[in-house]
Swiss-Prot record:
Domain of life: Bacteria
Biological classification of the source: Bacteria, Thermotogati, Deinococcota, Deinococci, Thermales
Stored InterPro entries: TRAM_dom
Protein name: Uncharacterized protein in scsB 5'region
Pfam families for the chain: TRAM (PF01938)
Protein family: Belongs to the ycf81 family.
Residues in TRAM domain copies: 24-85
Length: 93
């Protein structure tokens, strides 16, 4: 990218583009999520967003194999991407 800029050629980082196109989830947002597996703790369930971001759902292990509505409680940016924490929304079955 630096060489392109020096040469006057417009260039875009694929990584920057991918990050810009990710859905911007924030604390308090709700979404439907398929709980695929148990988390590190027995009560946790884990699902993934379309972009591959992991969502750890507190109290989600009992919903394994089900799609439920969750509420985002925390979002963390890591070196390898974003990690979200959530809880089942009221009325999740």
């Amino acid at each position: 990218l630096q060489l392109a800029r020096i040469s006057g050629v417009k260039a875009l980082s694929i990584q920057a583009l991918a990050q810009a196109l990710r859905p911007q989830l924030q604390v308090g947002d709700t979404l439907k999520l398929l709980i695929l597996k148990e988390g590190k703790e027995p009560h946790q369930g884990v699902g993934y967003l379309e972009d591959g971001s992991m969502v750890v759902v507190d109290g989600g292990s009992r919903y394994r194999g089900q799609e439920i509505e969750v509420v985002v409680t925390q979002a963390i940016q890591t070196q390898v991407g974003r990690l979200f924490f959530a809880r089942p929304a009221q009325g999740a079955q």
